[in-house]
Swiss-Prot record:
Keywords: Coiled coil, Endoplasmic reticulum, ER-Golgi transport, Glycoprotein, Golgi apparatus, Membrane, Methylation, Protein transport, Signal, Transmembrane, Transmembrane helix, Transport
Coiled coil: 133-155
Lumenal topological intervals: 26-179
Pfam families: EMP24_GP25L
Quaternary data: Probably oligomerizes with other members of the EMP24/GP25L family. Associates with the COPI vesicle coat (coatomer). Associates with the COPII vesicle coat (coatomer).
Stretch forming the signal peptide: 1-25
Protein name per the record: Transmembrane emp24 domain-containing protein p24delta4
Residue positions, PTM Omega-N-methylated arginine: 165, 170
Length: 212
């Protein structure tokens, strides 16, 4: 029985890995003047979890940064200053682009660029499956099925989001095309009116000069 469960578990793990978002650490090189940002377009009601760590090549100088995470409409979700590492977590309230910016603190980096390692997770990848397994008292294949169910649900929600975005973009495109058509008609009408006025003016001018 155990021999049959092992291949099944491996297969489920492979399916979850292929369906789930790939979570890799992002490396940013922050200039000693200015800031560097990372962003991701996320739909609403999605869990976001991220850890960040400043990496310095010189052990004598350990730079600090100011961190600000904002929602699509500018709401500040996380803000820290003079820090070398930290974590932020939130559940998105609206769909759009979420932005995390890192700015070097003055006189803490020796006027040299440095790097930041960011482990950014969203959706099913941000869930604490160990806690879920302990809470629901599940393990093995049952836990893998739970992960697979979450992955399928996340993909389904993402497809719905993409379909809604496509519908919104189509409406915007149709409105834009309609406005361009009206603008073209108005431009053509103005050109015709201006041409008629010019002809009328020239006719009156030549009649006044008795040229015609």
């Amino acid at each position: 029985m155990k021999k049959k469960m092992i291949p099944t578990t491996i297969l489920l793990s492979a399916l979850i890995f292929s369906l789930s978002p790939i979570c890799e650490a992002v490396w940013l090189t922050v200039p000693h003047t200015g800031s560097k940002c990372v962003s991701e377009e996320i739909q609403s009601n999605v869990i976001v979890l991220a850890d960040y760590l400043v990496i310095s090549e010189e052990h004598s100088i350990f730079p600090t940064v100011s961190v600000k995470v904002t929602a699509p409409y500018g709401t500040v979700l996380h803000h820290r200053e003079n820090t070398t590492n930290g974590q932020f977590a939130f559940t998105t309230q609206e769909s759009g682009t979420y932005l995390a910016c890192f700015e070097a603190d003055a006189k803490s980096h020796g006027n040299k660029d440095f790097s930041i390692n960011i482990d950014w997770k969203t959706g099913i990848a941000a869930k604490d499956w160990d806690s879920i397994a302990r809470k629901e008292k599940i393990e093995g294949v049952e836990l893998e099925f739970k992960k697979l169910e979450g992955a399928v649900e996340a993909i389904h929600e993402n497809l719905i989001y993409l379909r809604n975005r496509e519908a919104e973009m189509r409406i915007v495109s149709e409105k834009t095309n309609s406005r361009v058509a009206w603008y073209s008609i108005m431009s053509l009408g103005i050109c015709i009116v201006v041409s008629g006025l010019q002809i009328l003016y020239l006719k009156q001018y030549f009649e006044k000069k008795k040229l015609i």
